[in-house]
Curated annotation (Swiss-Prot):
InterPro entries: 2-Methylcitrate_Dehydratase, MmgE/PrpD_sf, MmgE/PrpD_sf_1, MmgE/PrpD_sf_2, MmgE_PrpD, MmgE_PrpD_C, MmgE_PrpD_N. This is 2-methylcitrate dehydratase. Induction: Activated by PrpR. Involved in the catabolism of short chain fatty acids (SCFA) via the tricarboxylic acid (TCA)(acetyl degradation route) and via the 2-methylcitrate cycle I (propionate degradation route). Catalyzes the dehydration of 2-methylcitrate (2-MC) to yield the cis isomer of 2-methyl-aconitate. Could also catalyze the dehydration of citrate and the hydration of cis-aconitate. The gene is prpD. GO terms for molecular function: 2-methylcitrate dehydratase activity; aconitate hydratase activity. Monomer.
């Protein structure tokens, strides 16, 4: 018989508001491959259990609803800053080729467009600068990637604000819980494989679909969003921004087919030819995935964290550390070497443990540089700050003094940092590093930082004020001040928005800004 569930407790600890500490009852689900001949009923499938969570009509806690609004503001901030970048312009042009009478909104422009294509364009805009929220555990995730597809569907179907919030809370919960339990990168599978099912589950909650429909939508979404991590390896291309947008678009289409009565490959995770057996750890391995027990509130969004700096999340604390260290070092020309002791994930994904020579190439793409901790640490050390455009400018990367310092920096895995990275207690998790700076004199300067300043446990944690400041700063010169304030007012009242009013979440960009976007050659969609 299938493995039984075991109840476990997770503690939520938030430094900015101790009263929010609480205990949630979670069910820990054993997930492994089964042979087709085995007795493995549908009700035991992981997709079915996720569908149960999605269909559970629990209330949304006020602080959770507030955080949803924060992340909508955060996405809008990053989208505004990315409006004239080439990948965003390409995705927008594709979406504008799909107008419909009663559709969704494309960020920055007027009109009504097919929800799947609007989600595509808005997903690329939100992801392009690698500047919105993150959750790190067994795998990596950017759960705000769920926002564009759910908002697009809500706009096309006239869903009210409260239902949109419910859907996003589910999407965050499922995305984060899968990230806690199933490691994808170990098997070179891209982390959008957790996003597709989360989008399907979130839409299911938002539309109050039945459990069976959600189950099939989840199965289809996972089946179609498993891809390799080559998108984040070596010379990283603009597809890194398109990948989550594609998963969101696929998730919408999966729900649409399931609503029309179509089924899905099953059991998608556990099948003899399924994801675990052939794409992940194989038939001998058992994963353990936590999900809220029936009736339990969905609060996982509160365990995620946004970015103050436009770079891979595991570089957030090192950037703050570099800014702090520069005053102690003084003359940077006196540096002989810098070794960053950090977690396994950080070492192999953005550090020298990746073995990617492209991470030291002054002519590398922006996407490659934002996954190069040696480059990021060097620039932050020299400038004492980080900027989403100036820090990546080609002339900045090619500066001779930067290249020289950059090549003095390496990373090593430290078992203690790896342990803290995977710690189940949010109050003890750490995503930082210890820097050992050796000067030509032989002096060694050592400092470390566990979490970024903007992290909930950091020195300057992000709250609504900081989210709004990030939006107004990045939207400056892109979105008129009156439009900025209109958008923020709509977000503030999201829970009270009636059917049809969610379209107000779109932000219109000054047409003169869009005129600066690169000229894109025509494609198939016109």
């Amino acid at each position: 018989m299938p493995d039984q569930d075991t109840k476990v407790r997770f503690f939520r600890v938030f430094c900015w508001c101790p009263v929010l500490r609480m205990v949630r009852i979670m069910l820990m689900h054993a997930v492994r491959a089964w042979r087709s001949a085995d007795d493995f009923p549908c009700t035991e499938h992981m997709a079915y259990k996720i569908a149960q969570v999605a269909a559970d009509p629990v209330d949304v806690d006020p602080e959770v609803a507030d955080m949803v609004c924060n992340r909508i503001i955060d996405n809008a901030a990053v989208s505004a800053a990315s409006m004239v970048r080439r990948p965003v312009t390409v995705a927008r042009h594709q979406a504008l080729a799909h107008p419909v009478r009663h559709g969704a909104k494309v960020f920055g422009v007027e009109g009504s467009y097919s929800a799947d294509w609007a989600a595509w364009a808005n997903g690329v805009a939100a992801r392009e600068l690698d500047f919105h929220d993150t959750f790190l555990a067994a795998d990596y995730s950017h759960p705000a990637d769920n926002i564009p597809p759910l908002v697009a569907v809500a706009q096309q179907l006239g869903v009210c604000g409260a239902e949109l919030i419910r859907g996003l809370v589910t999407a965050y919960e499922i995305h984060i819980d899968l990230t806690r339990g199933i490691c994808l990168h170990e098997h070179k599978i891209d982390h959008v494989a957790h996003l597709g099912p989360a989008v399907a589950a979130g839409i299911g909650t938002m539309l109050r679909l039945d459990q069976e429909t959600i189950y099939h939508a989840i199965g289809q979404a996972l089946h179609l969003t498993t891809s390799t991590r080559q998108s984040r390896k070596g010379a990283i291309s603009s597809w890194k921004a398109f990948a989550p947008a594609h998963a969101g678009k696929v998730g919408i289409e999966a729900v649409d087919r399931a609503m029309r009565g179509e089924g899905s490959p099953a059991p998608i995770w556990e099948g003899e030819d399924g994801v675990i057996a052939w794409l992940l750890a194989g038939p001998e391995h058992t994963y353990r995935v936590p999900l809220p027990a029936p009736g339990e509130p969905k609060r996982a969004i509160l365990d995620s964290y946004t970015k103050q700096h436009s770079a891979e999340y595991q570089s957030q604390a090192p950037i703050d550390l570099a800014c702090r260290l520069r005053e102690r070092i003084g003359d940077l020309d006196q540096i002989a070497s810098i070794v960053l002791h950090t977690s396994h994930h950080t070492h192999v994904v953005i550090g020298t443990g990746s073995g990617d020579p492209q991470k030291f190439d002054p002519d590398a793409s922006r996407e490659t540089l934002d996954h190069s901790l040696p480059y990021i640490f060097a620039v932050a050390l020299q400038d004492g700050c980080w900027h989403h455009e100036r820090s990546y400018a080609p002339e900045r990367a090619r500066r001779s003094d930067t290249v020289a310092l950059w090549h003095k920096i390496s990373t090593v895995e430290d078992p203690e940092w790896t342990r803290r990275y995977h710690c189940a207690d949010p109050a003890k998790k750490a995503f930082g590093a210890r820097a050992e700076v050796t000067l030509h004199s032989g002096e060694v300067i050592v400092d470390e930082l566990a979490v970024a300043d903007a992290h909930p446990l950091g020195t300057r944690p992000f709250e609504r004020k900081q989210y709004v400041e990030k939006f107004t700063e990045l939207a400056d010169g892109v979105v008129e001040p009156v439009e900025q304030q209109r958008f923020l007012a709509v977000v503030e009242s999201l829970a009270d928005l009636e059917s049809g009013a969610v379209g107000g979440l779109n932000v219109l960009v000054d047409p003169r800004v869009l005129d600066k976007a690169p000229v894109i050659p025509p494609g198939i969609f016109r």
